[in-house]
Swiss-Prot record:
GO terms for molecular function: class I DNA-(apurinic or apyrimidinic site) endonuclease activity; damaged DNA binding; oxidized pyrimidine nucleobase lesion DNA N-glycosylase activity; zinc ion binding. This is Endonuclease 8. Binds 1 zinc ion per subunit. InterPro entries: DNA_glyclase/AP_lyase_DNA-bd, DNA_glyclase_Znf_dom_DNA_BS, EcNei-like_N, Endonuclease-VIII, FPG_cat, MutM-like_N-ter, Ribosomal_uS13-like_H2TH, Znf_DNA_glyclase/AP_lyase. One of its GO terms (biological process) is base-excision repair. DNA binds at Q70, R125, N169. It comes from Salmonella arizonae (strain ATCC BAA-731 / CDC346-86 / RSK2980). It catalyses: 2'-deoxyribonucleotide-(2'-deoxyribose 5'-phosphate)-2'-deoxyribonucleotide-DNA = a 3'-end 2'-deoxyribonucleotide-(2,3-dehydro-2,3-deoxyribose 5'-phosphate)-DNA + a 5'-end 5'-phospho-2'-deoxyribonucleoside-DNA + H(+). Its cofactor is Zn(2+). It comes from the Bacteria. Signal peptide: none annotated.
């Protein structure tokens, strides 16, 4: 499943295609959304926001389309009039004079008013988004030490969208490698220095991935360009200490780590 950086880059791509342009045609597959087709035609997409792995497409009339890709959903951008060659099932089409965005295969799709946005179950449940530029390491540290999260092992906590939205498995293993911690650690047992390192890594690694992944020089390192240090690198040497990276399963997901320097 795509993680926060991939979802945000997808949102950027969609925004670049249709933001600020009049919608000339709107189509929804689900019956409960059909009444909104006429309400949105002639409106504009004002912005596309991410909340972890969910997308919020905001329209100029105050409505917002909530969509969660889950495992199989995918957005596409095409030239208006183009006929895509795909076996996927179309769920949403938002068309402008020159570009059209299409949502395929997703099933978790709703139209929300401004009031409903504040009470939506998923949006209420998710924590702050790691790609929100307003979120600080100090706020992350406070969440780590809060009664709700301080006793949780990082193996599960760093996959919990209620803690921080947008994290996922590759970010989990890369953040813990950067912090020299294992998945069994808990925030309550860390030193002040370890907490500070982890709090920064929880923001720095996702933001670096968003900014550079997919266009990186494989010889670059954290702090310059993003690339995997342990994810999918089991059996290889750890570039920090020379130990051999291992693979196991934690919280039902593959976990990669260096047992020599992650203590």
């Amino acid at each position: 499943m795509p993680e926060g950086p991939e979802i945000r880059r997808a949102a950027d791509h969609l925004e670049a295609a249709i933001k600020g342009k009049l919608l000339t045609d709107v189509w929804f597959a689900f019956a409960q959304l059909k009444p909104y087709e006429s309400q949105l035609t002639g409106q504009m997409v004002t912005r596309i926001e991410t909340r972890g792995k969910a997308l919020l497409t905001h329209f100029s009339n105050g409505l917002t389309l909530y969509s969660h890709n889950q495992l199989y959903g995918v957005w596409r951008v095409i030239d208006t009039g183009e006929i895509p060659h795909t076996t996927r099932i179309l769920r949403v089409r938002l068309q402008t004079a020159d570009k059209t965005i299409l949502l395929y295969s997703a099933s978790d799709i709703e139209m929300l008013t401004a009031e409903q946005l504040t009470t939506h179950p998923f949006l209420q449940r998710v924590g702050p988004d790691v790609l929100d530029a307003r979120l600080t390491p100090e706020e992350v540290k406070a969440r780590l030490l809060s009664p709700r999260f301080r006793n949780r092992q990082f193996s599960g906590l760093l996959l919990d969208q209620a803690f921080l939205a947008g994290l996922g498995n590759y970010l989990r293993v890369e953040i813990l490698w950067q912090s020299e911690l294992t998945g069994q650690h808990k925030a309550k047992d860390l030193s002040e220095a370890q907490l500070n390192t982890l709090s920064h890594a929880l923001l720095d690694i996702p933001r670096l991935s968003y900014a550079t992944r997919g266009q990186t020089d494989e010889n670059k390192h954290h702090g310059a360009q993003f690339r995997f240090k342990v994810f999918h690198r089991d059996g290889e040497a750890c570039e920090r200490c020379g130990g051999i990276i291992e693979k196991t399963t934690l919280s039902s997901r593959p976990f990669y780590w260096c047992p020599h320097c992650q203590k």
